[in-house]
């Protein structure tokens, strides 16, 4: 019995870790290291002083059970995408659930995954063992981790999104996603997918625009 209990405890501990009751920005400061491609001016350990609103916004949303969806209008230098990637790292480290990240095109998703997400996850101190164990299960658009999967998709067809059961959905550049003539808008499909999870969350962000173009 003791042997079985030890085996089950060891197996579960590979997937589930006790969440640290610390603020988003403090967790990032302890665990995230930014490469020169991610932060040209300030590579190295994450510094919360460089972004005031984004970490606090995600902190309030993720810890508030009264909210299931969050919509953000962001500028190009707001750091929202970076903090969304950091959020993914924390979820993988502390409360693994299936995650889906959607951009308007597959090529953008591939670029984000290869050049930003993978380096950030690989350098995350809280994911050192998890990333090493899962490294053979990685490619540019799909990641298999103990207890969950992480996928990146282009929003070209609703079918790419509709079939994925997810606990955390992130929609980037939602304003650029194609409109569906027959099916529901892809953002609505994402929101429907997270409703299957008791604690599912969906975050969508886009750039504010005026008639002449994007506001920077």
Where are these regions (language model features)?
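Phosphate/NTP-binding elements of NTP-utilizing enzymes
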Residues: 2-216
């Amino acid at each position: 019995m003791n042997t079985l209990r030890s085996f089950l405890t060891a197996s579960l501990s590979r997937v589930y870790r006790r969440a640290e009751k610390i603020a988003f920005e403090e967790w990032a400061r302890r665990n995230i290291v930014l490469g020169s491609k991610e932060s040209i001016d300030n590579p190295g350990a994450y510094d919360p002083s460089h972004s005031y609103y984004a970490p606090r916004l995600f902190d309030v949303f993720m810890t508030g059970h009264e909210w299931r969806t969050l919509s953000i209008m962001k500028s190009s230098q707001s750091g929202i995408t970076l903090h969304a990637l950091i959020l993914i790292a924390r979820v993988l480290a502390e409360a693994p659930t299936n995650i889906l990240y959607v951009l308007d095109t597959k090529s953008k998703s591939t670029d984000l995954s290869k050049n930003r997400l993978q380096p950030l996850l690989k350098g995350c101190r809280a994911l050192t063992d998890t990333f090493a164990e899962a490294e053979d299960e990685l490619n540019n658009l799909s990641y298999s981790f103990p207890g969950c999967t992480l996928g990146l998709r282009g929003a070209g067809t609703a079918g790419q999104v509709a079939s994925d059961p997810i606990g955390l959905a992130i929609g980037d550049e939602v304003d650029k996603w194609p409109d569906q003539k027959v099916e529901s808008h892809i953002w609505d499909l994402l929101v429907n997918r997270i409703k299957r999870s008791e604690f599912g969350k969906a975050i969508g962000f886009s750039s504010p625009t005026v008639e002449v173009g994007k506001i920077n």
